[in-house]
Protein backbone atom coordinates (compact mmCIF):
# COMPACT_ATOMS: atom_id res chain seq x y z
CA UNK A 1 0.00 0.00 0.00
CA UNK A 2 1.72 3.15 -1.15
CA UNK A 3 -0.87 5.70 -0.04
CA UNK A 4 -0.50 7.68 3.16
CA UNK A 5 -2.76 6.08 5.76
CA UNK A 6 -4.04 7.99 8.78
CA UNK A 7 -5.63 6.05 11.62
CA UNK A 8 -8.19 8.01 13.64
CA UNK A 9 -8.27 6.12 16.91
CA UNK A 10 -8.69 5.77 20.65
CA UNK A 11 -5.48 3.82 21.24
CA UNK A 12 -6.89 1.76 24.13
CA UNK A 13 -9.65 0.36 21.89
CA UNK A 14 -9.36 -3.26 20.82
CA UNK A 15 -10.87 -2.40 17.44
CA UNK A 16 -8.21 0.26 16.89
CA UNK A 17 -5.55 -2.23 17.99
CA UNK A 18 -6.70 -4.64 15.24
CA UNK A 19 -6.03 -1.99 12.61
CA UNK A 20 -2.59 -1.15 14.05
CA UNK A 21 -1.72 -4.86 14.26
CA UNK A 22 -2.73 -5.52 10.66
CA UNK A 23 -0.61 -2.61 9.45
CA UNK A 24 2.34 -3.66 11.63
CA UNK A 25 2.22 -7.26 10.37
CA UNK A 26 2.54 -5.90 6.84
CA UNK A 27 5.11 -3.22 7.63
CA UNK A 28 2.71 -0.44 6.64
CA UNK A 29 3.27 2.83 8.47
CA UNK A 30 0.27 4.57 9.98
CA UNK A 31 -0.01 8.19 10.93
CA UNK A 32 -2.05 8.14 14.12
CA UNK A 33 -4.58 10.70 15.36
CA UNK A 34 -5.82 10.13 18.89
CA UNK A 35 -9.33 10.98 20.10
CA UNK A 36 -10.61 10.70 23.66
CA UNK A 37 -13.97 8.98 23.34
CA UNK A 38 -14.63 9.52 27.04
CA UNK A 39 -14.55 13.28 26.42
CA UNK A 40 -16.82 13.01 23.38
CA UNK A 41 -14.14 13.96 20.87
CA UNK A 42 -15.70 11.69 18.21
CA UNK A 43 -19.10 13.36 18.66
CA UNK A 44 -18.07 16.90 17.78
CA UNK A 45 -19.64 18.54 14.72
CA UNK A 46 -16.18 18.67 13.08
CA UNK A 47 -15.51 14.94 13.58
CA UNK A 48 -19.03 13.97 12.47
CA UNK A 49 -18.73 16.11 9.34
CA UNK A 50 -15.13 15.38 8.36
CA UNK A 51 -14.25 11.90 9.65
CA UNK A 52 -17.26 9.69 10.41
CA UNK A 53 -20.90 10.74 10.58
CA UNK A 54 -21.48 7.70 12.81
CA UNK A 55 -19.16 9.15 15.47
CA UNK A 56 -17.17 5.96 15.90
CA UNK A 57 -13.55 4.96 15.58
CA UNK A 58 -11.38 3.47 14.20
CA UNK A 59 -11.44 5.17 10.83
CA UNK A 60 -8.64 5.07 8.30
CA UNK A 61 -8.11 8.05 6.05
CA UNK A 62 -6.65 7.45 2.61
CA UNK A 63 -6.11 10.71 0.78
CA UNK A 64 -9.45 12.46 1.07
CA UNK A 65 -11.46 9.26 1.59
CA UNK A 66 -12.39 7.61 4.87
CA UNK A 67 -13.05 3.97 5.77
CA UNK A 68 -14.81 3.50 9.11
CA UNK A 69 -15.21 0.17 10.95
CA UNK A 70 -12.23 -1.87 12.08
CA UNK A 71 -12.72 -4.91 9.88
CA UNK A 72 -13.26 -2.80 6.75
CA UNK A 73 -10.06 -0.91 7.60
CA UNK A 74 -8.15 -4.16 8.21
CA UNK A 75 -9.42 -5.59 4.94
CA UNK A 76 -8.40 -2.48 3.01
CA UNK A 77 -4.91 -2.46 4.53
CA UNK A 78 -4.38 -6.20 3.98
CA UNK A 79 -5.95 -6.51 0.52
CA UNK A 80 -3.46 -8.03 -1.89
CA UNK A 81 -1.23 -9.34 0.90
CA UNK A 82 -0.65 -12.81 2.29
CA UNK A 83 -3.18 -12.05 5.04
CA UNK A 84 -6.04 -12.24 2.52
CA UNK A 85 -6.58 -15.70 1.03
CA UNK A 86 -6.87 -15.80 -2.74
CA UNK A 87 -8.67 -19.15 -2.90
CA UNK A 88 -12.41 -18.43 -2.99
CA UNK A 89 -13.55 -20.68 -0.12
CA UNK A 90 -10.69 -19.63 2.15
CA UNK A 91 -11.45 -15.97 1.36
CA UNK A 92 -15.11 -16.43 2.31
CA UNK A 93 -14.10 -18.29 5.47
CA UNK A 94 -11.82 -15.40 6.46
CA UNK A 95 -14.75 -13.00 5.98
CA UNK A 96 -16.97 -15.32 8.03
CA UNK A 97 -14.60 -15.04 10.99
CA UNK A 98 -14.36 -11.27 10.60
CA UNK A 99 -18.16 -10.95 10.62
CA UNK A 100 -18.46 -13.48 13.44
CA UNK A 101 -15.98 -11.53 15.57
CA UNK A 102 -18.01 -8.33 15.29
CA UNK A 103 -21.27 -10.12 16.09
CA UNK A 104 -20.12 -12.49 18.86
CA UNK A 105 -16.88 -11.20 20.36
CA UNK A 106 -17.19 -7.43 20.16
CA UNK A 107 -20.66 -6.93 21.73
CA UNK A 108 -19.82 -9.21 24.63
CA UNK A 109 -16.12 -9.25 25.49
CA UNK A 110 -15.21 -5.82 24.17
CA UNK A 111 -18.24 -4.20 25.79
CA UNK A 112 -17.41 -5.81 29.15
CA UNK A 113 -13.81 -4.66 28.86
CA UNK A 114 -14.95 -1.10 28.17
CA UNK A 115 -17.41 -1.10 31.05
CA UNK A 116 -14.91 -2.53 33.54
CA UNK A 117 -11.89 -0.50 32.47
CA UNK A 118 -13.30 2.92 31.58
CA UNK A 119 -16.78 3.18 33.05
CA UNK A 120 -16.06 1.30 36.28
CA UNK A 121 -18.29 -1.19 38.09
CA UNK A 122 -19.61 1.45 40.49
CA UNK A 123 -20.71 3.67 37.60
CA UNK A 124 -22.66 1.08 35.62
CA UNK A 125 -26.37 1.66 35.09
CA UNK A 126 -28.85 -0.91 36.36
CA UNK A 127 -29.37 -2.05 32.74
CA UNK A 128 -25.63 -2.58 32.32
CA UNK A 129 -25.42 -4.49 35.62
CA UNK A 130 -28.19 -6.81 34.44
CA UNK A 131 -26.20 -7.52 31.27
CA UNK A 132 -22.95 -8.49 33.01
CA UNK A 133 -23.71 -12.20 33.47
CA UNK A 134 -25.28 -12.75 30.02
CA UNK A 135 -22.38 -10.93 28.33
CA UNK A 136 -19.82 -12.95 30.29
CA UNK A 137 -21.61 -16.18 29.37
CA UNK A 138 -21.82 -15.23 25.69
CA UNK A 139 -18.20 -14.02 25.73
CA UNK A 140 -16.96 -17.26 27.25
CA UNK A 141 -18.92 -19.21 24.63
CA UNK A 142 -17.30 -17.13 21.89
CA UNK A 143 -13.83 -17.74 23.32
CA UNK A 144 -14.49 -21.49 23.58
CA UNK A 145 -15.64 -21.62 19.97
CA UNK A 146 -12.49 -19.79 18.85
CA UNK A 147 -10.26 -22.03 20.99
CA UNK A 148 -11.92 -25.17 19.63
CA UNK A 149 -11.53 -23.95 16.05
CA UNK A 150 -7.90 -22.93 16.53
CA UNK A 151 -7.02 -26.21 18.26
CA UNK A 152 -7.85 -27.96 14.97
CA UNK A 153 -5.48 -25.71 13.00
CA UNK A 154 -1.70 -25.70 12.74
Regions found by a protein language model. Name each.
Residues 57, 148-154:
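Cytochrome P450 catalytic-domain "roof"
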Residues 16, 91, 142-145, 154:
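Secondary-structure boundary/capping motif
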Residues 131-150:
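Amphipathic alpha-helical packing segments from all-alpha helical-bundle domains
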Residues 1-131:
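GST-like domain detector, emphasizing the conserved glutathione-binding G-site
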Amino acid sequence: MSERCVLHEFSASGNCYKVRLTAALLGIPLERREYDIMKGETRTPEFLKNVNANGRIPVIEIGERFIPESNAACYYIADGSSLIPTERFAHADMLRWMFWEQYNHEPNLATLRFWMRWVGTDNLSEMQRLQLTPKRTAGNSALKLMDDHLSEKE
